[in-house]
């Protein structure tokens, strides 16, 4: 939020921090969650939202086969531009997004590298995280049996090699033989979302050996620890929480030396909807 005009102050010497800056806590990581279940924008609303995107973004949204996936993707792209515009204090139209060789989107204009963000959408929710200087990763999962699988047992057999023996033992805790049920599926998705959040934070996808990363999760507190290649990793802070009874969300936030033993702050914000405005900035539709 822009501050109002106030009394003028003498500028600090170049390279010196003011007392307020020295005492101010590090900026919190922004985390926005938008529930999109049941959102079916009219053609005019969708066209208005798409008009604010780059051509490459519009093409990515339209490539999704199912309408609900297109709606989630569209909402996510709009949220990205809204968050970046607020953080950099620019008009969304001034923002240009590009992708790394590994496919991770980043802000290319107006100020390259000034804001890190990551988006996830699955089930009923879209979640976006962002911070000016910390790498971030987020992944949301809905607790449901994947489409196209005949049984949970078949699904678990297919995914077994994505986890370390320790992780797999915790996921299958209490299982008898090959039989698995809803509690095991929930734990599966919790560990899976942690791995995904980490990979998204470091900007690597295909080619990373998932068994290199072994997570230990305290389900009560949501605090997770990562052992990477057999050694405790301290580069990132990991947290898992519930958006509702059917969805979990994992976040990975880069840890800075100045943080000491404190975990980076995460400021969660549940959005009521997406505002669609005309040329004069008048709200036409609250599209939630």
From Swiss-Prot:
**Residues binding Mg(2+):** 139, 196
InterPro entries cross-referenced by the UniProt entry: 4-PPantetheinyl_Trfase_dom (IPR008278), 4-PPantetheinyl_Trfase_dom_sf (IPR037143), AASDHPPT_N (IPR055066), P-Pant_transferase_sf (IPR050559)
Free-text biotechnology note from the record: Polyunsaturated fatty acids may be beneficial in prevention of cardiovascular disease and treatment of mild Alzheimer's disease.
Q: Please name the pathway.
A: Lipid metabolism; fatty acid biosynthesis
Q: Does the keyword Magnesium apply?
A: yes
Swiss-Prot/TrEMBL catalytic activity: apo-[ACP] + CoA = holo-[ACP] + adenosine 3',5'-bisphosphate + H(+)
Q: Which GO terms describe its molecular function?
A: holo-[acyl-carrier-protein] synthase activity; magnesium ion binding
Which residues are recorded as binding CoA? 60, 99-104, 118-121, 196-200
Question: One Pfam match, by short name?
Answer: AASDHPPT_N
Predominant localisation class:
cytoplasm
Subcellular location per UniProt equals: Cytoplasm, Cytosol
Give the domain of life. Answer: Eukaryota
One annotated Gene Ontology cellular component of this protein = cytosol
| EC number from the UniProt entry | 2.7.8.7
Give GO terms for biological process.
fatty acid biosynthetic process; lysine biosynthetic process via aminoadipic acid
Q: Which UniProt keywords apply?
A: Cytoplasm, Magnesium, Metal-binding, Transferase
- Kindly state the subunit structure of this protein: Monomer.
| Function (record text) | Phosphopantetheinyl transferase that is essential for attaching phosphopantetheine to ACP domains of the polyunsaturated fatty acid (PUFA) synthase converting the inactive apo-synthase to the active holo-synthase.
To which protein family does this belong?
Belongs to the P-Pant transferase superfamily. AcpS family.
This protein is called Phosphopantetheinyl transferase
Q: Which organism is it from?
A: Thraustochytrium sp. (strain ATCC 26185 / S-3)
The encoding gene is: PPTase
